[in-house]
UniProtKB/Swiss-Prot annotation:
This is UPF0173 metal-dependent hydrolase BAB2_0644. InterPro entries: Metallo-B-lactamas, RibonucZ/Hydroxyglut_hydro, UPF0173, UPF0173_UPF0282_UlaG_hydrolase. It comes from the Bacteria. Keywords: Hydrolase. Belongs to the UPF0173 family. It comes from Brucella abortus (strain 2308). Pfam families: Lactamase_B_3 (PF13483). GO terms for molecular function: hydrolase activity.
Length: 237
């Protein structure tokens, strides 16, 4: 399995049977400078969304139309995407597990919000925010936390799914900050590797992963992969 951070909370996950984009906010993403759009979206089969904010839905509609990718999202967000012309949708909700070729995806809790600004500037609620747990046939289990704060039921997520790789928001202000994110990883999970995200993009959130790296320093069993956007990481089952 290969995982590429595309800036902010966007990731490309490649396995033998699927190419999954998570929260594909590319155009207009300050953290995606230097990311080639065509290469980032090449061969995409699925798009998975954690919630309905514009910096996570991003280019979903355009990518889904161009590539015929299946979009996996909370039911309310999926309905809205259908109204925007997305044809291949697989809706779910918190606690639900959806099966696709080579992997399953489970919607778990996240502490955040989920809405999209309408043309008249009013926020339209788009269901609950989620974290996403991916179980693969031939690759380590992956947990993208979405946008969230720490919460004690992360312990249940670990008990039920035992994720080996974590994608963790660390930028503060709209999510937990680096120190709290490090606490979440250490207290509730046994990750082999973690990829921090939701930083180094907009100026009002943290510009570096320094606080997270410092918080993880006394937990050497977990490898922190805080590399520049565009870096490809490979993982074996």
């Amino acid at each position: 399995m290969k995982i590429t951070w595309l800036g902010h909370a966007a990731f490309r996950v490649e396995t033998a049977k699927a190419v999954i984009l998570i929260d594909p906010f590319l155009n207009g993403n300050p953290g995606a400078k230097g990311i080639d759009f065509k290469e980032a979206t090449r061969g995409v089969t699925h798009i998975a969304l954690t919630h309905g904010h514009g910096d996570h839905v991003g280019d979903t509609v355009a990518i889904a139309r161009e590539h015929g990718a299946t979009v996996i999202a909370n039911a309310d967000l999926a309905s809205w995407l259908g109204s925007q012309g997305v044809e291949k949708l697989d809706p779910g909700n918190t606690g639900g597990t959806l099966a696709h070729e080579g992997f399953t995806i489970t919607f778990v809790n996240a502490l955040h919000s989920s809405a999209m600004l309408t043309e008249n500037g009013v926020s339209q609620a788009l269901g609950n925010p989620n974290g996403l747990v991916f179980h693969f046939e031939d690759s380590p289990t992956l947990y993208h936390m979405g946008d969230t704060d720490i919460f004690s039921d992360m312990a249940l997520i670990n008990e039920l799914h035992q994720p080996e790789i974590g994608i963790v928001p660390i930028g503060d202000r709209f999510t937990m900050g680096g120190a709290v994110a490090a606490l979440a990883c250490q207290r509730y999970f046994n990750f082999n590797s973690v990829l921090p995200c939701h930083y180094a993009s907009f100026p009002i959130i943290d510009r570096t992963a320094d606080k997270f790296i410092a918080g993880m320093a006394d937990h050497p069993a977990t490898k922190v992969l805080a590399d520049p956007a565009g870096t490809v990481h490979s993982f074996q089952a």
